[in-house]
Curated annotation (Swiss-Prot):
Sites where the protein binds heme: C419, H603
The protein's name in its UniProt record: Nuclear receptor subfamily 1 group D member 1
Species name: Rattus norvegicus
Up-regulation conditions: In bladder smooth muscle cells, exhibits night/day variations with a peak time at circadian time (CT) 4-12 and a trough at CT16-24.
Region (Modulating): 1-129
Keyword Glycoprotein: no
Role according to the record: Transcriptional repressor which coordinates circadian rhythm and metabolic pathways in a heme-dependent manner. Integral component of the complex transcription machinery that governs circadian rhythmicity and forms a critical negative limb of the circadian clock by directly repressing the expression of core clock components BMAL1, CLOCK and CRY1. Also regulates genes involved in metabolic functions, including lipid and bile acid metabolism, adipogenesis, gluconeogenesis and the macrophage inflammatory response.
Amino acid sequence: MTTLDSNNNTGGVITYIGSSGSSPSRTSPESLYSDSSNGSFQSLTQGCPTYFPPSPTGSLTQDPARSFGTVPPSLSDDSSPSSASSSSSSSSSSFYNGSPPGSLQVAMEDSSRVSPSKGTSNITKLNGMVLLCKVCGDVASGFHYGVHACEGCKGFFRRSIQQNIQYKRCLKNENCSIVRINRNRCQQCRFKKCLSVGMSRDAVRFGRIPKREKQRMLAEMQNAMNLANNQLSSLCPLETSPAPHPTSGSVGPSPPPAPAPTPLVGFSQFPQQLTPPRSPSPEPTVEDVISQVARAHREIFTYAHDKLGTSPGNFNANHASGSPPATTPQCWESQGCPSTPNDNNLLAAQRHNEALNGLRQGPSSYPPTWPSGPAHHSCHQPNSNGHRLCPTHVYSAPEGKAPANGLRQGNTKNVLLACPMNMYPHGRSGRTVQEIWEDFSMSFTPAVREVVEFAKHIPGFRDLSQHDQVTLLKAGTFEVLMVRFASLFNVKDQTVMFLSRTTYSLQELGAMGMGDLLNAMFDFSEKLNSLALTEEELGLFTAVVLVSADRSGMENSASVEQLQKTLLRALRALVLKNRPSETSRFTKLLLKLPDLRTLNNMHSEKLLSFRVDAQ
């Protein structure tokens, strides 16, 4: 967005505001030092503010008081609570939000009204214009960390990332206006502002403007001036000339993120996998809900022991006798699997998300290895479909006869077990408890995609807003997976078998600091398994667990509550139909919902505590 300001004094101000809407709006030197950017446009709301046609980086606005305008409130980041809260806590180039680092603020040199902050000896000029800091609006001293910034904001950002400073929580809902005179009041909001305008540890760190960047900015400014001069005569009042449609570089305010338990994995893939909300469909009958959910549950969920050919008990017997377990084609066609425990957790998380999105195709980046032992960790192997298998257990093959694609068809004695989950605490000696817990959480990653796909097939789920869809998935995925994998907890033997076909005792895992959470998981699994739910009942209960109207951050709780009631009616009808004599069975099933919420909170707190300790 570009704004122009003209007055009777010499010079004037031209302010280029990043299309992401993250730079403060200023239309006069006085507003450069105002305590709140909101005041600059609140005083100009009367008259006929009209928008210029879009420029290469945004649109121009007209101010009736000075024949030029200011940025509409909806596009000013300091006026939108969502802008400050939507930025992440890690410095990454993803914070450009479609706005190139060259989107800038400049001011015509006017020493009587624009002065650098204290300690600033260098003023970055471009053809007689003074560049302004994208964070606070002070005079920029150069091109620092990917944007034009003043010495104060450059040093502040450098200290923040080098010392990994955790700033105190903002007392104003992370909605502080960051300008020159108050930039030190709230350090958390200032750091988020740095990230939102595009500052990154991976970006340019030196003060000189690259030649290509300088040429691009000059062309951008000249084009904006030409548009302003040519279009002034044809401007109309706002009531008769609608605002132009936002360009690809303009980003409107996004809803504030909903506080939710620490997610198991990165959920950035949800918006891509979910569909936009559609027009409300007719409310389905109870029979339709039961049949649709049961079918989705039966066809979508594959990461469960009942789909792997053997039950936990049978597997333990086979494993004790040395016979490899049987596997089904569904298991072989896994669409992505965890990396080995030897990988860095963050890198593993990135690979998981890429695998879930189908971004990584073809052979693995790891060289294939074939250990000769009875059970080893091995590297990822591509199967014939291009999907990678993660062989947690590799049963030895005759020497020199290893198949090229890592899969020997028709020979159950020499088979790679594709593991949808890969929890292996003993994969490397000397591993910390934090690393083991990270692997424990990461082990759920491959099943997340199935949860998303299952949600899309719940009648009425896609009628919800995309924000509410994502919020429900973020908050409820762990609970859904807990229901899915409850059968993997053997209460009698006090063991848990992960889908890697590796069994661990409760005592063994409890010694690693997992006792409280695992005890709660065992108790829940015992209670849920005692109800002996059918496949249809389990599918409907899974849908009820996911669609919970009391999740924090919902936009339209009424719609979610209505969908939840529909699912509850269907579940009640099905339970009473299957066992009409057990009238308390439905009530007992509903009592598992608060137990799941407790487990979710326990897992989030445990994972968060380990992450804090690891820093």
